Amino acid sequence: MESFISFMQEIKKNNVRDALDKAISSGSLHCVVGLVASKDEILFEHAAGFRDEKKISPMNVDSILAIASSTKLITSIAALQLVEAGIITLDDPVSKYLPGLQDLKILDSFDGQELCLVPTKETPTIRQLMTHTSGYVYPFWNKNFFEADKNKTIKNLYAQDGYLEIPIAFEPGSRWAYGIGLDILGEVIKEVSQMSLYEYFSENIFQPLEMHDTAYQLSEEGFKRSVTMMQRLDNSFIASKPFQPSINSSYAKELGGEGLYSTAVDFSHVLQMLLNQGSYKGHKILSDSMIDLMFSNQTGSLEIVDSISQIPSITKDFNLSFGSKSHWGLGMIYHPEGTQYGRSKGSASGAGIFNTYYWVDREVGHCGFFSTQLVPFFDDKVIEAYQEFESSIYS
């Protein structure tokens, strides 16, 4: 740990800063923020570029970001708190808490008009919801669900109680596919806590972690610090109209798998807590044993595989293992062999569709956060910039 902190002296910080600045000066990104922290302190933070389309407002480390699927980490932590408290257990069927999912169906095929639905043998468990082995998928990366969603043949998460009518793509536990399991888990948290997700998160996670800028809804002050969502257009950028931040956000429903706004600094407090075995400034968020479960293989022989895009303008094909053998832990991607860009064996990571990425390396004793606000997800130039950022830290 001490060796890494000494490693992050001014010459090293300059190299990391240069990697971020290069992404802007080369035209690869319109804005970027990067942060590195130990369990006790922020070692490096830097922002570059502009957070608005007209290039008037500079990007800052406290700029408000739509963190999208990075919300899943918060939901996972909340669920593990409930496991610790004995309110739920990891291998309970989700129907124990949401009886409307007792007769869940599998979407076997879709011919453009009719859904072919078959019954499941088992109901997904809490653990399977957390590890993307439940059968719940995103239409973004599943052809049958994309076509059915496009034809409005199935409900989606945004409909009132829509989650009750969403089928799954395969028998729970039989495959791995990135999906909406954490959104379903969010419904479980609301049901057993009798609180909204924001109320639960605020009381049990945000307040003790001093995450004052993290919420589902933007305040007027937060909106003034928010970042315009951009879309790559050849060698330039345009505002991506469907995903713009607003004070009256479309995420009023509060989903467990997406929708939070945060900052690099706020989110780093979560990562620091994970580095410190569940503690942050005297507050114990999770037990040591729960933290260890998060950093362990929870999918057995099921490895992370490619997710093939159905909407290239929003997401590219992606694989979050970054070329190394990876599984899913409880809440994050687990890298038993590390990664080719320097992360240690047993490290963990995650991402959000607007190109937010983070990792936690317990062996070295640091965590990292990198974000722009851009679609499509896993954009080639974003990944190149992210890998240069990470490599400059580990080199």
Predicted regions located by residue number:
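Short, conserved catalytic-motif segment at the N-terminal edge
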Residues: 7-67, 87-89, 103-110, 115
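Active-site SXXK
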Residues: 14-21, 40, 66-94, 103, ...
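A short, polar/charged loop-to-alpha-helix boundary motif
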Residues: 51-60, 377-388
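Short, surface-exposed loop or secondary-structure junction motifs
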Residues: 96, 102-342
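Short glycine-rich, acidic/polar surface loops and turns
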Residues: 319, 331, 351-360
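Short, well-ordered beta-strand elements
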Residues: 358-359, 365-374
